[in-house]
Amino acid sequence: MNTADSSLLADIREVNLSYLLLAQRMLRDDYAASMFRLGFSNEVADILMRLSPAQLVKLAGSSSLLCRFRFDDYSLLSALTQDVLGGALQQAHATILLAKQPVEQLA
């Protein structure tokens, strides 16, 4: 493995760990709102809440990103890029579009 590949893998692990730690913190602070914001089902949120720091580090060590870019819908992405009413309308529209997306579960 060359230096660029190992650097990329290290960056992926760092993003994964940051994401998992943030998700746990969000769920502890406001479980229901965080499930909505993260797009988690009850089962996934419960599992994530129970993971120990060692388990988080092990899970973060994956060579794949654990978080998913949810802006794969043109209408959602365009809603976020239009400045209407100082951004309030676009934020509401984006929230509605995100809420319509199905909750994905860890396989």
UniProtKB/Swiss-Prot annotation:
Location relative to the cell: Cytoplasm
Species of origin: Bordetella petrii (strain ATCC BAA-461 / DSM 12804 / CCUG 43448)
Protein's name in the database: Flagellar transcriptional regulator FlhD
Alphabetized SUPFAM superfamilies for the sequence: Flagellar transcriptional activator FlhD
Alphabetical list of Gene3D superfamilies matching this protein: Flagellar transcriptional activator FlhD
UniProt gene name: flhD
Keywords of the record: Activator, Bacterial flagellum biogenesis, Cytoplasm, Disulfide bond, DNA-binding, Transcription, Transcription regulation
Chief place where the protein resides: cytoplasm
UniProt-recorded Gene Ontology molecular function terms: DNA binding
GO biological process, one term: positive regulation of DNA-templated transcription
UniProt record similarity statement: Belongs to the FlhD family.
Gene Ontology, cellular component aspect: cytoplasm
InterPro entries referenced in this protein's UniProt entry, alphabetically: Flagellar_FlhD (IPR023559), FlhD_sf (IPR036194)
One Pfam family recorded for the sequence: FlhD
Domain topic, free-text comment: The C-terminal region contains a putative helix-turn-helix (HTH) motif, suggesting that this region may bind DNA.
Role: Functions in complex with FlhC as a master transcriptional regulator that regulates transcription of several flagellar and non-flagellar operons by binding to their promoter region. Activates expression of class 2 flagellar genes, including fliA, which is a flagellum-specific sigma factor that turns on the class 3 genes. Also regulates genes whose products function in a variety of physiological pathways.
Record text on subunit structure and interactions: Homodimer; disulfide-linked. Forms a heterohexamer composed of two FlhC and four FlhD subunits. Each FlhC binds a FlhD dimer, forming a heterotrimer, and a hexamer assembles by dimerization of two heterotrimers.
